[in-house]
Amino acid sequence: MPYPHPYPWQSSRRRRRRRGRDGAPRQPQARRVVERAAAGPGHATTTQQPDNVSSAKVFQTSRVETESEIAKWPGKPQDLEDEHQAEEAELQPLIDQVRAMLRSMNDGDTSASAYDTAWVAMVPKVGGDGGAQPQFPATVRWIVDHQLPDGSWGDSALFSAYDRMINTLACVVALTKWSLEPARCEAGLSFLHENMWRLAEEEAESMPIGFEIAFPSLIQTARDLGVVDFPYGHPALQSIYANREVKLKRIPRDMMHRVPTSILHSLEGMPDLDWPRLLNLQSCDGSFLFSPSATAYALMQTGDKKCFEYIDRIVKKFNGGVPNVYPVDLFEHIWVVDRLERLGISRYFQREIEQCMDYVNRHWTEDGICWARKSNVKDVDDTAMAFRLLRLHGYNVSPSVFKNFEKDGEFFCFVGQSTQAVTGMYNLNRASQISFQGEDVLHRARVFSYEFLRQREEQGMIRDKWIVAKDLPGEVQYTLDFPWYASLPRVEARTYLDQYGGKDDVWIGKTLYRMPLVNNDTYLELAIRDFNHCQALHQLECNGLQTWYKDNCLDAFGVEPQDVLRSYFLAAACIFEPSRAAERLAWARTSMIANAISTHLRDISEDKKRLECFVHCLYEENDVSWLKRNPNDVILERALRRLINLLAQEALPIHEGQRFIHSLLSLAWTEWMLQKANKEENKYHKCSGIEPQYMVHDRQTYLLLVQVIEICAGRIGEAVSMINNKDNDWFIQLTCATCDSLNHRMLLSQDTMKNEARINWIEKEIELNMQELAQSLLLRCDEKTSNKKTKKTLWDVLRSLYYATHSPQHMIDRHVSRVIFEPV
């Protein structure tokens, strides 16, 4: 069964929040390159030359798309230069602040839960005066200090009826138990009276964990304590009472006492429990699945010493206001890395991220993980996120872990779950995209999660029971539309900047809670400023390229202004850092000149003598007299020589000097030219009757791009090795074969109905090749760092071709506008 092809391309037309621009960070080399680019080619010649879803239906969509226009060029280069003046030093305070946050990570920073605090407050004093006083008075003080002005308890920034009702009732019960604060109890009961009707209006997806059992249990406790002024018979409660009975009957009583399950997290208020058996399932830290409320209830029922030690420890740690769940160390470490990477700012925190991933790897098990280390219950959400990040960071993790979450052809988050979580399947899909050859369980996970999420999308049901996020539907859509191979780094960052809610994103446990190291405005501010800084630099480079394009008359060879933008966009979307301007501009310029020469060679292919002379002139630089008869030949010959001079000047300096760089660039271009001239007419072009698409290069141009990028990056040894030994390097050969397949697939896609079978076959071949390449790229080995970087360049350029092959033009143009021109 083929992989589900994720490209129906449902273009989003949401209005995006726009913010003011900042300048772009500048590195010395980037400044030099930008000045030359803006100056134009006349300044570049001062140095003397040294000698389940059918792949064929990719572009068919049920919606009518209007072609997006690329945003217009900015005004004057000086305007952009003024905007670019802010140095990277302006970002340093934010970078330092985030770094301090990352280095503070321990067992998880999370907000207090009034509900859990109330359960701990209900624990009577051990060995005291018959239980007439609370064992943990700090929790009572916290309750008194945190009542909201409307009489309720709960999250003050986001109103959820479920959250406010269960928090408020729990706090009223706790205060009533100790006959404290009658006025506060009265205010809480008044709030419950006035808002009970809201429970009937709430969506089921936003119901906290175990609410159907915990809330009725609290109501019964209130009744037992003699709380009179409570609407016990309110109509909104009837369905909750009924659901409680249904859920209690569904709980496998014997199993929950024999093996660890997620039920351990919600024991409070459950009747008829066999505590001696349940104590055998206690977590190693003394808790019941890291739940303060469940553990407090167990402590009241058993007096267990380990339960007491766990509760006592967290009460002291959090000054009375205990969290909804603790610890959450693995959850925090994993999600922090994910947020930093998707926001496009991970490059500032490589050491901290490496420490996070080492921590996660130490606690990884073949059965999976949970939100906390050493958990005896695992879940697919944390497991999938950890698997994906560990694999992307080079750790050797087996996909067989997902067999623990598969049954009867379906995948689940927890054993015995009642509903499927959208984010669980979302993260499973993201993990399944990082697959190697032969990993069938990941194939099954990808098919299942893809179909589940697409169905929810069609139903308008992308809502989750674990998080209230700013734009979860947008996150899901992007992941399905642009899987890992097709997700270019700067496109992902620009998209996620509009989706990340910062401190406003809220998690759903037994109550609403917040993870300040996962969701905060500091990350968002740094990411926005960093993106806008980089974007300003990219706009300067675009202005320089526009001038360079016109001065070299590339329009005479079929290269259009939009092609300039698209070529630069592919480079900037993969190599975006200010310090790598030379590599980025080398990629864009080489792509455009190569396209122009390719067009020219096709145009003169019938004139064998002219073709031979043109190629001969380009590598015999002193023999140019014949060119006077052919103005177009003169234009291209001059443009290429200027480009080689410019690239040699902008390349990272090396010990051998600029002349050696110039020689290597000339050699790479000469070899490419000879291959292009001697190449037979491509049978795919002949069959399709169309010109090749400039964004999807053939293997010769693909290798030329990589060689030029490596030379300009100063990795000369790798570039020389590539030129001399590419036929013997399997990684290079496989990337070239994949490039050919992408080129072929792009041509066939002009008539998907006619070529559906062939496209499907090619897609399978491309998928297998990409899996094999990914395995070689990601797994840690003893390669030199420079070799790994060269592999990364091969991979980045190939991914850009994969993206261009599978993206309709209007979508590419939309991304060009958002990445290059539209500030966040």
UniProtKB/Swiss-Prot annotation:
E.C. number(s) listed in UniProt: 5.5.1.13
Protein residues bound to substrate: 247, 465
Cofactor list: Mg(2+)
First-listed, main subcellular location of the protein, grouped into a coarse class: plastid
Binding site residues for Mg(2+): 379, 381
Functional pathway: Plant hormone biosynthesis; gibberellin biosynthesis
UniProt-annotated stretches for the region Disordered: 1-87
Catalytic activity, as annotated: (2E,6E,10E)-geranylgeranyl diphosphate = ent-copalyl diphosphate
Domain of life: Eukaryota
Motif DXDD motif per record, residues: 379-382
Transit peptide segment: 1-63
Record field: compositional bias (Polar residues): 44-63
Gene ablation phenotype (knockout): Dwarf phenotype due to gibberellin-deficient mutant, displaying reduced internode lengths, foreshortened broad leaves, and unbranched tassel.
Protein name in the entry: Ent-copalyl diphosphate synthase AN1, chloroplastic
